[in-house]
């Protein structure tokens, strides 16, 4: 029987949803990940979610490891078959979340393509109003990643949930208690936004954290600016970027966060390819040190 997990924050990683999910989890489980976030790109309609959940939970049985969330990343706010499939994927994941032992479904909020962010708010409300109710009826929460996917305030293809101003507008359009954020510092840092003040302000709405950091090359910015020929920001695995995750986890704890920090790999410019899992396990151990190992108080 697995030892009871005492801490309120787990450290895990993202896993692609599909035919290789179960075997991938089986192989990396010994590294010490405490949670897994199963993610789909655009659609999950080709996956038997019930069977996947059964197979995953069989692998995790007795380990104490959990599925933190199930996710689908696409643009549900547009017309066309791809957007329709993405909306249907949200529905199916909401319905199947409990089979995985989670109450959290995450992804992109979507966007009306190449229109300013405010133009998406009516469509966002129309799409996610029913989805939020469907989720609430099943005890499920929804969370949107704060990823701009190359978009700006004026134009973009994927996601409106980019910055605190966007989150305020989304909340005003659809003030549902079961809608929150899938937050990470990286997506703010690459826009030169300090992530810590927003973390303190929004921690109560953060349902899930992606473990991803950034390195900002200030020497490049000073010499070339942010529109010059040199790249000045890089997505990094935690432990290799600029953030102090001891501070981040302290603020999460102080704000009452109970949930998972799951490493979002496959972005680091150094620890990639053959070094992907080397970097992820280094990030896992770093985040565990920042969290500190739970030690029960003496009972006297």
Write out the residue ranges for each language-model feature.
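Acidic/histidine-rich catalytic cores of soluble enzymes
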Residues: 7, 26, 35-36, 70, ...
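Short, flexible/disordered intra-domain loops and linkers
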Residues: 46, 152-161, 270-278
